[in-house]
Amino acid sequence: MEWLDLPLVRCAAGKVRLPGSKSISNRVLLLSALAEGTTTISNLLESDDTGRMLDALKMLGVAVTRTDEDQYLITGCSGRFSVKEADLFLGNAGTAFRPLTAVLSLMHGHYHLSGVPRMHERPIGDLVDALRQVGAVITYLEREHFPPLEIHPAAIHPADILINGNISSQFLSGLLMALPLAGEPATIIVNGTLISQPYVTLTIAQMAYFGVQVERESWLRFIVPGNQIYHSPGKIVVEGDASSASYFLAAGAIAGGPVRVDGVGRDSCQGDIRFVEALEAMGACIKMGSDWIESSAPGCRSDGKVLKAIDFDCNHIPDAAMTLATTALFAQGTTTLRNIASWRVKETDRITAMSTELRKLGAQVESGDDFLRITPPDDPLVANTVIDTYDDHRMAMCFSLISLGTPVRINDPHCVAKTFPDYFEKFTAITHQ
């Protein structure tokens, strides 16, 4: 196994240009493929997840042209993929697997969808159940309620659709993006509390950019009017990834700063932008512009405080919340992260993985179905700890912050290629001994 040794660094300061948002990139790719016309996409995230989506769209007959390293031309299929039979391998990309499952179920074709072993452990039953309510014919090829899947041609009849909201917002997002293809009105009724609501807001905003409207009644009912067609907006610039911003902003809060991220700011449509609220609650100094954010340690404040522990509801920032778990090691007191049940079904069981690795560093950790409670050690963090990353990009990036307190070894550092291939180069560029 490969590893990366990060030496102790005393200071974090500098500027980072963020890669494109993963959530926006894969939504925009899919909507561009479904639209009438050609869409030019700038600042598309270059990563394993977006690569899986691009490969799938090409196999489905979508014309994709790369003009340079930062622009793609996607010629849409006007709502119908020309290829009616395909075997798609989607790795561990939930932002590709879930929406494509929904869209392909309405394509009157025969498709196989599979991924890496971990993808086959991530539940998809709630989405399949919802699609079956409109007539989709989907078969589980191995285990009930989990990928891989086989999708068969079917007659689709939109109706009221009931879907559980407590597992993954990607199920609802996938349904929303797919239903306009049916051409008839449809209503989605959410059962229970919808988690990760900002991601659904993001989906609706991107759909509107392509000319399709969704009516929302609170977070319980979503109406997709009939006779709507996706139209290319012409050009799209993908804003920077707010989840990726969290590591650099946390570094500034822990180790002096200022650290500035460019590409995302006050005007962002991403829910993870609210990570800065947690940092401010911990005492960090935050400045924001329309498309940039800057963080510094509490020492920049007149009261001279250090970072302090927080009790924080993370429902709106499920990915960036992981960064709070490692930041908590540099705060005074016990930090509690709540409403993180979705961590269990991500790239790994993140509650278990995070608890295990934090304990290696000397932290006291208490965990439950939907919370994590972290108390940093009284003594210094255990030096030269070997951190396992579980093939989870966010585990690797979160634990890079440990180098701001002690040397650390990160196993399998290349797992960051899922969303941020050059993360460690950018991280080391803003950290100084």
Swiss-Prot record:
One matching Pfam family: EPSP_synthase
Keywords tagged on the record: Amino-acid biosynthesis, Aromatic amino acid biosynthesis, Cytoplasm, Transferase
Binding residues for 3-phosphoshikimate: 22-23, 27, 168-170, 196, 319, 346
GO molecular function: 3-phosphoshikimate 1-carboxyvinyltransferase activity
Cellular component terms per the entry's GO annotation: cytoplasm
Top-level taxon: Bacteria
Pathway stated in the Swiss-Prot or TrEMBL entry: Metabolic intermediate biosynthesis; chorismate biosynthesis; chorismate from D-erythrose 4-phosphate and phosphoenolpyruvate: step 6/7
Location within or outside the cell: Cytoplasm
Reactions accelerated catalytically: 3-phosphoshikimate + phosphoenolpyruvate = 5-O-(1-carboxyvinyl)-3-phosphoshikimate + phosphate
SUPFAM superfamilies: EPT/RTPC-like
EC number, UniProt record: 2.5.1.19
InterPro entries: Enolpyruvate_Tfrase_dom, Enolpyruvate_Tfrase_sf, EPSP_synthase, EPSP_synthase_CS, RNA3'P_cycl/enolpyr_Trfase_a/b
UniProt key word Amino-acid biosynthesis: yes
Gene3D superfamilies associated with the record: Enolpyruvate transferase domain
Annotated phosphoenolpyruvate binding sites: 22, 94, 122, 170, 350, 394, 418
Main localization (coarse): cytoplasm
GO BP, one annotated term: aromatic amino acid family biosynthetic process
Catalytic residue positions: 319
Entry keyword annotation includes Cytoplasm: yes
Subunit structure: Monomer.
Family statement drawn from the similarity comment of this UniProt entry: Belongs to the EPSP synthase family.
NCBIfam families documented for this protein: aroA
Function: Catalyzes the transfer of the enolpyruvyl moiety of phosphoenolpyruvate (PEP) to the 5-hydroxyl of shikimate-3-phosphate (S3P) to produce enolpyruvyl shikimate-3-phosphate and inorganic phosphate.
Protein name (Swiss-Prot/TrEMBL): 3-phosphoshikimate 1-carboxyvinyltransferase
Organism: Nitrosomonas eutropha (strain DSM 101675 / C91 / Nm57)
Phylogenetic classification of the source organism: Bacteria, Pseudomonadati, Pseudomonadota, Betaproteobacteria, Nitrosomonadales
